[in-house]
């Protein structure tokens, strides 16, 4: 284990030197229930890693509402038929499973479906309350072949994933009460593709394109956000160090950096190839201090600056105990002060 003065050192370069996505762009074609999102640039392979993980969580782990039990007036069990109703009870139950709902509470809610007139009975006949709203009002529940009273009492709950009828807590099968298999997930479909992304002259980075379709109870961007939070919380247990230690080490290194005499060197003093030197000059980088404050991403975006030049410069910085992405407060001011001292000494 790497230590300094008996203290453990955290090598933050393992994650700070990776290219990070700049923004999650939402496509203009997105709607309240469909979202197309583009995330770039990502290190090669990270598109598949993140896309697959997000897809699994989106489909399996988000909370949603579903009907878990139904009591149809005059019906004893799900294999019954109802006079004056074209569909049998089994068909009605299958139709109820298609109803999508939005709930504003974690407490179970009771709803009622009422109809009297001949014709189609759709989910819009379900009487919601201030805690529950019906999203899929066009779903056909049953068809009345004559005028008659038709009533279904429903129980709605929040949950996640798929729960079989016999697994609902606190509900037991009894005469007249029909338990339903419930699919709680508010996310209906997730697809992702990986394309090439460009960083400077390099094209071997990933672009993650994520398409999410929901039932309307949650916005696609919120679904992604919640899923990312779930993944973040689950991965925390694998981090075996306090990130404050990492910050402390970063501060110690910053103190070392500010004492480093190489900071004020001109890039002309470095043993770099002509191509690398010219690239730095074209980016208006004159000193080592200016150079090391650039991130890998910023460097690779520089015109005509490729991976080979980047690796060459990175090795030179390492030889001086420096690296990309470091920060020095008021570097320009310190550089000017150093120049004045140098001119005074030379005079």
From Swiss-Prot:
Stretches the record annotates as Alpha N-terminal domain (alpha-NTD): 1-242
EC number: 2.7.7.6
Sorted UniProt keywords: DNA-directed RNA polymerase, Nucleotidyltransferase, Transcription, Transferase
GO biological process, one term: DNA-templated transcription
CDD domains with a match to the protein in the record: RNAP_alpha_NTD (cd06928)
One of the Pfam families matching this protein, by short name: RNA_pol_A_CTD
GO MF annotation list: DNA binding; DNA-directed RNA polymerase activity; protein dimerization activity
Source species, domain of life: Bacteria
Subunit annotation: Homodimer. The RNAP catalytic core consists of 2 alpha, 1 beta, 1 beta' and 1 omega subunit. When a sigma factor is associated with the core the holoenzyme is formed, which can initiate transcription.
Function: DNA-dependent RNA polymerase catalyzes the transcription of DNA into RNA using the four ribonucleoside triphosphates as substrates.
Protein's recorded name: DNA-directed RNA polymerase subunit alpha
Gene source species: Solidesulfovibrio magneticus (strain ATCC 700980 / DSM 13731 / RS-1) (Desulfovibrio magneticus)
Taxonomic lineage of the native organism: Bacteria, Pseudomonadati, Thermodesulfobacteriota, Desulfovibrionia, Desulfovibrionales
């Amino acid at each position: 284990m790497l230590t300094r003065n008996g203290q453990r050192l955290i090598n933050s370069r393992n994650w700070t030197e990776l290219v990070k996505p700049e923004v999650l762009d939402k496509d203009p074609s997105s709607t309240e229930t469909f979202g197309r999102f583009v995330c770039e640039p990502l290190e090669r392979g990270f598109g598949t890693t993140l896309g697959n993980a997000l897809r699994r969580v989106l489909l399996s782990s988000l909370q949603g509402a579903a009907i878990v039990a139904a009591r149809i007036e005059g019906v004893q069990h799900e294999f019954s038929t109802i006079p004056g109703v074209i569909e049998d009870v089994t068909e009605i139950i299958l139709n109820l499973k298609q109803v999508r709902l939005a709930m504003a509470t974690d407490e179970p809610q009771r709803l009622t479906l009422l109809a009297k007139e001949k014709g189609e009975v759709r989910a819009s006949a379900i009487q919601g309350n201030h805690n529950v709203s019906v999203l899929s009002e066009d779903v056909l529940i049953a068809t009345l072949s004559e005028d008659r009273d038709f009533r279904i009492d429903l129980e709605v709950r929040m949950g996640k994933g798929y729960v079989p009828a016999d697994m609902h807590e606190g509900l037991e099968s009894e005469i007249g009460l029909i338990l339903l298999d419930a699919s709680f997930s508010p996310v209906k479909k997730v697809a992702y593709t990986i394309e090439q992304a460009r960083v400077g002259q390099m094209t071997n980075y990933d672009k993650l394109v994520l398409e999410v379709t929901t039932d309307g109870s949650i916005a696609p961007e919120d679904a992604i956000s919640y899923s990312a939070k779930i993944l973040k919380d689950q991965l925390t247990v694998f981090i075996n160090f306090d990130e404050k230690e990492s910050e402390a080490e970063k501060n110690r290194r910053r103190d070392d950096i500010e004492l480093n005499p190489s900071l004020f060197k001109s890039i002309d003093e470095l043993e770099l190839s002509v191509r690398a030197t010219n690239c730095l000059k074209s980016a208006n980088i004159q000193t080592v201090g200016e150079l090391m404050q650039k991130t890998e991403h910023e460097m690779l975006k520089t015109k005509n600056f490729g991976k080979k030049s980047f690796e060459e410069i990175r090795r030179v910085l390492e030889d001086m105990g420096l690296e990309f992405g470091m920060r020095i407060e008021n570097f320009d001011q310190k550089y000017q002060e150093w120049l004045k001292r140098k001119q005074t000494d030379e005079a």
